[in-house]
Each structure stands twice: as C-alpha cells, then as structure tokens.
Regions:
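Intrinsically disordered, compositionally biased charged tails
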Residues: 1-6, 222-270
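Ribosome large-subunit tunnel/peptidyl-transferase-proximal elements
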Residues: 1-185, 191-201, 206-209, 213-228, ...
C-alpha cells in the first residue's frame, strides 16, 4: 500500500507534541508550529515509509524475518493484527530482556510453549491433578502472553519495527546490539538518531499507527510474493502535497477538524 499525504492528514499523523517538549534533533522533520504544537512536514514521512517498505520487501524476498514491536496500549492490538496478517512476528506485551541478545535462551522458552500446546492437543493434561493443571495453565498463559507472537521464529530478525521509541527503547537497544535494522515512528519529542529509519509521525494517534504499520505489513506481503515495490505519485497525491506546502490557511482549517481529539490522546500520554 502506498501511503499518501491525504491519508496521513486524515489520520492526524502531522500532529507533533507541544513545542516546549520537542527534541531539537527533530527540527528537520518539522514543517511549522501552530497553537503551541509542532506540525510535521509529511514529505519526510512519506519518504521514510517508502524507504522502509522497499527495504523490508527486499529482505523478505531474501528469506529474512521481521518483528513488530508495540507495547503501549494504542499499538498493542495493531502490531498483533498486522504481524499476523503478513505472517511475521510481534511483541505487544512487556519486552523480555535478552529476547535478541540472548536469543538461544529465549528460544528455549518458546520451545517450552510449543511443547505445552502439543500436550494439550494430545490430551496429556487430562491426567493432571487439579493442582498440576492449575500450575500448567499458569505457566502456559504467562509464556503465551510474552512469547505467543514469536511462535515459530527460528532466527534473529533482520528488521525490527517499533511503534514508540521511548516506550520500547529496550527493544531498540537490543536490536542495535545484534545489528538488526530498526524502523520506528518518531514523534517531535523523540531522538531520531537511535533508529536506522525514523518515520516522523504522531505516535499516539491510533489511526496514524495503524496506517503506517499496515503499509509496512503490506511490504512484507509484497516481499513474500516476490514483488518489487514501484512507487508512482498519483495526480491526487501531487495536489495534496501542493496544498500542504503552499496553503497554510487550508492546512490550518483541515487541522481544526481533528485537533481537539488528537490533542486529548497526546495529553493522556503526557
């Protein structure tokens, strides 16, 4: 899926945080300031999504795997749905330390989960006492909670997508240590230098997270199908970009439509 400027505007991807909370390293991604809020230059967002999509598709064609990470409440269900849709892996609960840097040990815990699932399917648990069954279920539920999205993973992922650099900094730190490529949404209060491909965007709005995560999941699917991503700018997109760049009054009017709702979501996070 090719993401357009119009789509990004509609989901509120252009809303940053309050200007007083910004990270100066994000300056190059900011278009303007309105009502004390930084507004993203969505040209950079589109460029980053396209770059990430091409890279993901290329690696998937080569047989590499990817993990989607989103442990904050707005992203949890999205990363699960999109990872499952494209047949990749995900973490949407707490990041377990060593997941990448001590991968062989983590694999043992995933293997244990698989064995417990097989035991249930074979009916082995029918022989358990009440206490044994209770302990079995407790262990299985815990493993499923933290490792259910990693079932079947056999090697360290080449690409790690993170929905929030601050919330999931541990995932980023481990990914960099094992030389995985990190793609992440970066809001105006984030440090873009901690990831390989920063995607400047509102990282609190559910619809923005969904749109961008879906685009990356589509890239996985295209890579599996052996397709080369070719991006052509449509006439509609060119008009939207021209509007965004040249007519600030129209932008401001558009922004007002979803401004209050988007700011409420950000204030909850802050």
């Amino acid at each position: 899926m090719q993401v357009t400027m119009k789509q990004l505007l509609e989901v509120g991807a252009h809303f940053g945080h309050q200007t007083k909370r910004w990270n100066p390293k994000m300056k190059k991604f900011i278009f303007m300031e309105r009502n004390g809020i930084h507004i993203f230059d969505l040209r950079h967002t589109i460029d980053a999504i396209e770059k990430a999509s091409r890279m993901i598709a290329d690696f998937v064609r080569q047989g590499e795997v990817m993990i989607f990470v989103g442990t904050k409440k707005q992203a949890q269900e999205i990363v699960k749905e999109e990872a499952e849709r494209c047949g990749m892996y995900y973490v949407n609960e707490r990041w377990v330390g060593g997941l990448l840097t001590n991968f062989s040990e983590i694999r043992k815990r995933i293997d244990r989960l698989e064995e417990m699932i097989r035991m249930e399917e074979r009916g082995d648990t029918s022989k358990f006492t009440y206490k044994e069954l209770k302990e079995f279920k407790k262990e299985k539920d815990k493993l499923m909670k933290f490792f259910g999205g990693l079932r079947g993973i056999q090697k360290i992922p080449k690409v790690v997508f993170v929905a929030d650099t601050k919330k999931d900094i541990n995932a980023i730190t481990e990914a960099r240590k094992v030389k995985s490529i990190v793609i992440s949404l970066v809001d105006t209060n984030c440090d873009p230098d901690v990831v390989d491909i920063p995607i400047p965007s509102n990282d609190d709005a559910i619809r923005a997270i969904k749109l961008i995560t879906s685009a990356l999941a589509d890239a996985v699917i295209e890579g599996k199908e052996g397709k080369v991503i070719e991006l052509e700018k449509k006439e509609e997109e060119e008009k939207a970009e021209e509007l965004f760049l040249t007519n600030e009054e129209e932008i401001e009017e558009f922004m007002k439509e979803g401004f209050d709702k988007e700011m409420e979501e950000k204030e909850e996070e802050e």
